[in-house]
């Protein structure tokens, strides 16, 4: 190593240390080392921290593009986290849509055999919907409509690739200053139902469909539509619709609004125990949505009612939602593309080891950086 310089604002004075003969640079961000290709230059700005790691904004000196770099530290310490990282990389490389976040690069590790951290480079967005909602910014009726339209437009493409997002929530809905929306965080995505979903992560339950709360192993794209309904209600009211403290409370909040399901609405539950459990819950009539959401446009209320249906088989589909009257100012089927080829999760073998995943991620980084 040789030479040091400083970058960043007065708030974050971040030292730059060249490594590996100057091919890489190292930054100390929040006490964590951040080592990336030298093309990523200051200003380096921390923009987020989460369970998966730290995210910094930087500039690609080759293209001049502003990017977001996510460091996933100790990415191969356990198989679940390793699979999640590989899954997101492969999914985002497969997809190409205006309303889905773009992966720009995987920083190629300096040494093939000795690396534990993964750096994923995305296009930089200005904020996310959760931050907007928490800041008490008032979204206009037109802004709300455009956000919901873009979310559904992106979701149509995702579903056409045979992918279920499974974790749509405001913090995964990314925005820029032009009010353009992109869906992010595909780490929990799947093509089909997976029993390991329930144990894999504690997903924010506020946006989870009833069939997931009830441990239903056979679920469909309708789970994402439920989440969009929760988001629609929240951007219209400024408050989460179902801020459950636990699973029981979550189900109660849902049934208090949409009404307790009758027997004909429980066909999606294969388990007798699950059906018995739902039947013994306190009974609630469906609320009048117009009374509950007095400031929402009538057409928005109608769309919300069609999304927040307890029985997933009766929930509106993404294509039907895009064609709904509420979204008619934006809807144009010719400008709502689908994915040309379905995504395959064949790389996820049950016998897959951390070392195998490490090798696959290395190969992904080489695809971005063949002349390293």
Swiss-Prot record:
<keyword id="KW-0927">Auxin signaling pathway</keyword>
<dbReference type="GO" id="GO:0071244">
    <property type="term" value="P:cellular response to carbon dioxide"/>
</dbReference>
<dbReference type="GO" id="GO:0005886">
    <property type="term" value="C:plasma membrane"/>
</dbReference>
<feature type="active site" description="Proton acceptor">
    <location>
        <position position="167"/>
    </location>
</feature>
<feature type="region of interest" description="IBR5 binding">
    <location>
        <begin position="210"/>
        <end position="372"/>
    </location>
</feature>
<dbReference type="GO" id="GO:0009733">
    <property type="term" value="P:response to auxin"/>
</dbReference>
<dbReference type="GO" id="GO:0004713">
    <property type="term" value="F:protein tyrosine kinase activity"/>
</dbReference>
<keyword id="KW-0067">ATP-binding</keyword>
<keyword id="KW-0597">Phosphoprotein</keyword>
<comment type="similarity">
    <text>Belongs to the protein kinase superfamily. CMGC Ser/Thr protein kinase family. MAP kinase subfamily.</text>
</comment>
<comment type="function">
    <text>Negative regulator of the auxin transduction signaling pathway. Involved in stomatal movement regulation by phosphorylating and repressing HT1 and HT1-mediated GHR1 phosphorylation. Required for CO(2)-mediated stomatal movements (e.g. closure).</text>
</comment>
<feature type="binding site">
    <location>
        <position position="70"/>
    </location>
    <ligand>
        <name>ATP</name>
    </ligand>
</feature>
<dbReference type="GO" id="GO:0090333">
    <property type="term" value="P:regulation of stomatal closure"/>
</dbReference>
<dbReference type="InterPro" id="IPR050117">
    <property type="entry name" value="MAP_kinase"/>
</dbReference>
<dbReference type="GO" id="GO:0005524">
    <property type="term" value="F:ATP binding"/>
</dbReference>
<feature type="modified residue" description="Phosphothreonine">
    <location>
        <position position="204"/>
    </location>
</feature>
<keyword id="KW-0547">Nucleotide-binding</keyword>
<keyword id="KW-1003">Cell membrane</keyword>
<feature type="binding site">
    <location>
        <begin position="47"/>
        <end position="55"/>
    </location>
    <ligand>
        <name>ATP</name>
    </ligand>
</feature>
<feature type="short sequence motif" description="TXY">
    <location>
        <begin position="199"/>
        <end position="201"/>
    </location>
</feature>
<dbReference type="GO" id="GO:0009734">
    <property type="term" value="P:auxin-activated signaling pathway"/>
</dbReference>
<dbReference type="InterPro" id="IPR008266">
    <property type="entry name" value="Tyr_kinase_AS"/>
</dbReference>
<keyword id="KW-0418">Kinase</keyword>
<feature type="modified residue" description="Phosphothreonine">
    <location>
        <position position="199"/>
    </location>
</feature>
<dbReference type="InterPro" id="IPR000719">
    <property type="entry name" value="Prot_kinase_dom"/>
</dbReference>
<dbReference type="GO" id="GO:0010119">
    <property type="term" value="P:regulation of stomatal movement"/>
</dbReference>
<keyword id="KW-0539">Nucleus</keyword>
<dbReference type="Pfam" id="PF00069">
    <property type="entry name" value="Pkinase"/>
</dbReference>
<comment type="subunit">
    <text>Interacts with IBR5/SKIP33. Binds to HT1.</text>
</comment>
<dbReference type="GO" id="GO:0004707">
    <property type="term" value="F:MAP kinase activity"/>
</dbReference>
<dbReference type="GO" id="GO:0016301">
    <property type="term" value="F:kinase activity"/>
</dbReference>
<dbReference type="InterPro" id="IPR011009">
    <property type="entry name" value="Kinase-like_dom_sf"/>
</dbReference>
<dbReference type="GO" id="GO:0035556">
    <property type="term" value="P:intracellular signal transduction"/>
</dbReference>
<dbReference type="InterPro" id="IPR020635">
    <property type="entry name" value="Tyr_kinase_cat_dom"/>
</dbReference>
<keyword id="KW-0472">Membrane</keyword>
<dbReference type="GO" id="GO:0046777">
    <property type="term" value="P:protein autophosphorylation"/>
</dbReference>
<protein>
    <recommendedName>
        <fullName>Mitogen-activated protein kinase 12</fullName>
        <ecNumber>2.7.11.24</ecNumber>
    </recommendedName>
</protein>
<keyword id="KW-0808">Transferase</keyword>
<dbReference type="GO" id="GO:0106310">
    <property type="term" value="F:protein serine kinase activity"/>
</dbReference>
<dbReference type="GO" id="GO:0005634">
    <property type="term" value="C:nucleus"/>
</dbReference>
<feature type="domain" description="Protein kinase">
    <location>
        <begin position="41"/>
        <end position="327"/>
    </location>
</feature>
<feature type="modified residue" description="Phosphotyrosine">
    <location>
        <position position="201"/>
    </location>
</feature>
């Amino acid at each position: 190593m040789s030479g040091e310089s400083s970058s960043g604002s007065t708030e974050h004075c971040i030292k730059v240390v060249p490594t590996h003969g100057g091919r890489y640079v190292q930054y100390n961000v929040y006490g964590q080392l951040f080592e990336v290709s030298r093309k990523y230059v200051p200003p380096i700005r921390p923009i987020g921290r989460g369970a998966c790691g730290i995210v910094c904004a930087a500039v690609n000196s080759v293209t001049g593009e502003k990017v977001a770099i996510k460091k996933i530290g100790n990415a191969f310490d356990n198989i679940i986290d390793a699979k999640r990282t590989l899954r997101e990389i492969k999914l985002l490389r497969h997809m190409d849509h205006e309303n889905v976040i773009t992966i720009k690069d995987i920083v190629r590790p300096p040494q093939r055999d000795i690396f534990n951290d993964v750096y994923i480079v995305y296009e930089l967005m200005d904020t996310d919907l959760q931050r907007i909602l928490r800041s008490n910014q008032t979204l206009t009726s037109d802004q709300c409509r455009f956000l919901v339209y873009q979310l559904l437009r992106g979701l149509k493409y995702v579903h056409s690739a045979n992918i279920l997002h499974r974790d749509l929530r405001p913090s995964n809905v990314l925005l820029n200053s032009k009010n353009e929306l992109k869906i992010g965080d595909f780490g929990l995505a799947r093509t089909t139902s997976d029993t390991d979903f329930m144990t894999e992560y504690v997903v924010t339950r506020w946006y989870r469909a009833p069939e997931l709360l009830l441990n239903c192993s056979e679920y469909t794209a309708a789970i994402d539509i439920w989440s969009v309904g929760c988001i629609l209600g929240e951007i219209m009211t400024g408050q989460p619709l179902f801020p459950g403290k636990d699973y029981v409370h979550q189900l109660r909040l849902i049934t208090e609004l949409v009404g307790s399901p009758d027997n004909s609405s429980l066909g999606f539950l294969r388990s007798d125990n699950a059906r018995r459990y739902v039947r013994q819950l306190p009974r609630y009539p469906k609320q009048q949505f117009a009374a509950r959401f007095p400031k929402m446009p009538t057409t928005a209320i109608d769309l919300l009612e069609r999304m927040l249906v307890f029985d997933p088989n009766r929930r509106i589909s993404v294509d039907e939602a895009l064609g709904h009257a509420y979204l008619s100012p934006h809807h144009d089927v010719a400008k709502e593309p689908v994915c040309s080829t379905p995504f395959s999760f064949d790389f996820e073998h049950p016998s897959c080891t951390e070392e195998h995943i490490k090798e696959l991620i290395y190969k992904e980084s080489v695809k971005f950086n063949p002349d390293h």
